[in-house]
Amino acid sequence: MRAKRMVVGLLAAVATAFAGLTGSATAAPDHTDVDPLIVGGVNATQVYSFMVSLQNTSGGHFCGGSLIKSNWVVTAKHCVQGKTPASVRARIGTTNRTSGGSYVAAAAIHLNPTRDIALVRLAAAVPQAPIKVAAASGPVGTATRLLGWGQTCPSPGGCGAPVILQQLDTSIVADGLCSGIFGAQEICTNNPGGTRGACYGDSGGPEIKMVAGAWQLIGATSRSGGGSICAVKPSIYVDVPVFRPWISGIAGPV
């Protein structure tokens, strides 16, 4: 997966927490359908034009995503599996998931047949600048940043989702630190201090790295790398650059 290339709801079996965090998140109080959020992060220090909040028709956030073209969003498959385009809305390019940016309906959903990645085609192009998909995720030690509106406390359903986007600086770690990872197609990402990382509500959201002064997309939040309590273990992200051929075959070159 690179030189060593690095949820929306509880799964019935706690062991694979985060990884189905989209459809099951309805159990969380006060934020129906919310996926992992970032535990131990801080309020976003800038507006990320490409940041997407996937929402139901009532405006409830359930997953994150990344704008990769003016009318295409990449997210986790478990976020949109079983959903119809008519049931999905996207708020794009704001740090507040309830206001600002562009608010657009989904027109089509494409699920990858084997891994936890999906594409959402928007009903209309938006003016926000998309993020470039990186050439590769990078080796162990690559500095990255996570973004999301997921739960900010580690226990499932223990708190609501923040209104303001959260960010967390972290790094790629060895695949062996993530249980159940598909190393050639996924990224194992550190949980700094053993207490900070993605949580319920963050699923589908971006893992990004800085390249020549600009953010590039390397990952989409997928699941925990071990355990149902958020941030106590490294977490797993789909390696988006690996799926460039699949993405380009549907959305056009990226």
Each predicted region: which residue ranges?
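C-terminal subregion of chymotrypsin/trypsin-like serine protease catalytic domains
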Residues: 2-9, 23-30, 67-77, 167, ...
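Structural detector of coil-to-beta-strand junctions
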Residues: 49-53, 130, 187, 206
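Conserved H-D interstitial segment of serine endopeptidase catalytic domains
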Residues: 54-55, 73-76, 81-112
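N-terminal activation segment of mature serine protease catalytic domains
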Residues: 29-56
